[in-house]
């Protein structure tokens, strides 16, 4: 009855020593007692394979490979001792919730905290730690008077209340999984299990007090217990504790066992020290042996040769990093005879690498096993249950409904879900619209039109969806006993036929050979039912709001995981560094060696801080390590990772993450470079494999095909490529799988993305109206000037975005224009002059108009939610303020409002605007002028055109020159040319102006009077545009003008002339602009009707048309593609623009004159 220690650094053969001793016992038939090999839970499968390989099947007649948990299960099966079921983590959290609620009156420190999401899990972790470290209620009570820290005292006191109540309730129906080893300890003492057996304990770094108790019992009754320790001679002989020593955690574990041996009179057999021999793992590999010896040694010896078994790679990003690993693995397997099972890839942040490894390894045909448990939270069954609750919780929100439908378990066809989604988004269906008695009869559903077949189908789909959900909601809504809520969940799953669909999926997965999916979906059903059953057992009689129960259930789902066993033996193992021990690894790739990742940076302290743990340790309550200690323990994990491979090691780190943010290399990289000064750091630019082997890019079909594309691009651009690529091309061209893809390469190389021409006849059919006339609005022609292709898609092909129930900027524009028009009509009906309107009167009229509109249109979006009702009130303020400013502007001048919302350009009413194209084609322009003001002055009539804008719009001559801002000038030209028809007299231009609808915020460092505020508002909302260069007309727009105007963009000098900052033009310049714009419209129309739909968006300064275009995904404009270039709007000076405009008009007139003379 003794304990023997087996010492050895990493690679010295400690595990081999254990298996050899077991083999020796079996071969020599020394006795017939059991031989036990005790290893951590995650290593049992691999260790059994090792024994099978080293000893053979006959080993298992006497040998058992166990973990502590597996030992407990075996003992309970053979000797009894556990009659109750082990509670799941979810049930445990439910029980904690119940215990906290029942004792909430005694909890002051945790009272508010207990309502926060995740608190139950935090308490669960503390209780689990108490149990693993044998902290009983009595031991907590014993330290009550010893704690001087008031906060810690209260914290421990309340933890004791929860802990004690938890244990009492737990033992009524279940056993806590953390109590298993305590029960095992008792059962071992009561039984004769393992008497005279020999035990080898391998691969452990440390033991919990529970595990130490088991070791103590085994040591007392077994012939001998052998325990391996990964430690060097220096640390072994050092009796003082050094937290910075990489082997400190091992030394600490050894000391704990020595203490147990001393206290229990357990014999100490002479230890085996394997450090004195050449490391078994590194025989013949001096480089890896050098890492093991010197990476954590100070001082260290440099390795003065060129390393061949170590590679250091600096990756551009994670994708580049894993692709380099994939190339290396493929090369080693193909050229060096390695098996995939000899290779492992590890990192410290597996979640960041999981998906990218899956994609790239699939491309390279590399079989792999991801050593990570599957989280069930994203499983469709969990999603279905969660979203069923969320639909009730979030009142049938779009997100919750379609999360439910897209789980795939509802039985609704995907095509119907897509059609329903469009309908839901267009009509903003949520809340009462889902739950109304008969959807088909609802006003919002029928609208003003007929009940179409499509709507009938939508109503049927909605009914099929809502019936089981509403039945479920009726059962759980409000406060109910948990057992009734659980019954409702089960009945709902049966109603929706979930279990039948899952069974169908499992059959499909089996046919496709997706073993991991088969395992996941086979277990998820029983896991969910177990969670529901445990909820009934643990808190079944408790009455809870459905929302509170859903919170508890969600935390239960979040904690559920499924462990996966490898489905094949020859696979690359991928996992976390912490789980790499216990494997025979010949080749290891450590990826993601970045600062703060490896070694991992400091972790969260948890409910009990480092200071709390230190204080508790001083009074006899010893718990797990502090975060400071855990940081040093990371060094040991790093040591194990660096020394686990026997033949080859590759270290790599990315320089940037997926978002392009830079990442720093870990101190590991700099340390390796110092130990191996001749080690060359490779990268995508400097890849030794490619430099040494020109065929290094020919690997697996998919990555080689990707390289072929790059090479063909180089060849197309007249760059040098290796001659063998022509043979590679021939191979792919003759391969059935890649033949079509090869053809697409040539299409891609010659792809210019410029947009084909469309025939004139087709364009006429697309653009002409019912009377076969070509009618365009001025704003549409501006859009063509911005980008011909975008115009063609929107107005030629009639492409539209999916309708969404929201208030968009165009909706706001229409709403504002309608309200301003209604306001003008109201003022006219009441016979009130604009100049007589007060701010209060403006507010009153606008408020009444908006209220009436919302009352008349009950289904308006502005009536739908509190958010939109708030917006309606805000629009009242904005429009009222704007109307007040407009009234003030009109009151300051002599111009009178002539027309508002004036439609012109209809080919059937005087043909107000007609463009005669060069091929005798006629184009009719339509438009709507927001407001026309007129002034009779000295026998002349002047007109002022005003356009209301809800967004920022400035007058820009550059944009006029390029045809991007011609609306106001076209309107002006139409009015002047047709003034007799419209105004019964000839008119002259007075101004063309933009007015911004806004309620500006006035900022000031000093207190302001009402008059000063009003002046600042007028200044902020001053109209922008062009004004006739005539002092009489300007003063007729602002009779109060003194120096500068608060109404228009004009200001006077002291001598009465206009300042240079004034936006004023002469009547002749107005004529020139009108003529230029008229010709520009003709030019645009001719270009458009010629079939030119080139992809050429404009770019003004740093703003490109594409930034606001809804059709970018269609044209796929990319400046990297040949012929994809912006039409750059060059910002020229005002003088240059005028010179260019006049020059173009003169040239055009000369050309017309020559043509007329020739005729």
Curated annotation (Swiss-Prot):
Residue spans crossing the bilayer: none
Class of this enzyme: hydrolase
Keywords: 4Fe-4S, ATP-binding, DNA damage, DNA repair, DNA-binding, Exonuclease, Helicase, Hydrolase, Iron, Iron-sulfur, Metal-binding, Nuclease, Nucleotide-binding
NCBIfam families associated with the record: addB_Gpos
Family from the record: Belongs to the helicase family. AddB/RexB type 1 subfamily.
Note: Despite having conserved helicase domains, this subunit does not have helicase activity.
Task of the protein: The heterodimer acts as both an ATP-dependent DNA helicase and an ATP-dependent, dual-direction single-stranded exonuclease. Recognizes the chi site generating a DNA molecule suitable for the initiation of homologous recombination. The AddB subunit has 5' -> 3' nuclease activity but not helicase activity.
Protein name: ATP-dependent helicase/deoxyribonuclease subunit B
Organism: Clostridium beijerinckii (strain ATCC 51743 / NCIMB 8052)
Gene this chain is encoded by: addB
